[in-house]
Amino acid sequence: MNKHFLFLFLLYCLIVAVTSLQCITCHLRTRTDRCRRGFGVCTAQKGEACMLLRIYQRNTLQISYMVCQKFCRDMTFDLRNRTYVHTCCNYNYCNFKL
């Protein structure tokens, strides 16, 4: 019985590890296409997606921000002469490719 339980537990851990969503993190990516702060990879938890926030001023990309985000949803809004574009996705490293 214990061997079967251990086998099933290891199989479950392997499946979870293989199917976990991986996202790029970058807390400050500049127009020169370079991450200045927080570059890495996060593993999305339950209910999280990969998120990319792009901030434009006069239709020119100023900075972007990438992270694992809970309650992520696609949206665009304008505030103080800037346009904020939130984009969410659900496959590995997708927030870097958008």
Swiss-Prot record:
GO terms for cellular component: extracellular region. InterPro entries: LY6_UPA_recep-like. Specifically expressed in prostate and testis. Its main location: secreted. The keyword rRNA-binding does not apply. Belongs to the PATE family. This is Prostate and testis expressed protein 3. It comes from Homo sapiens.
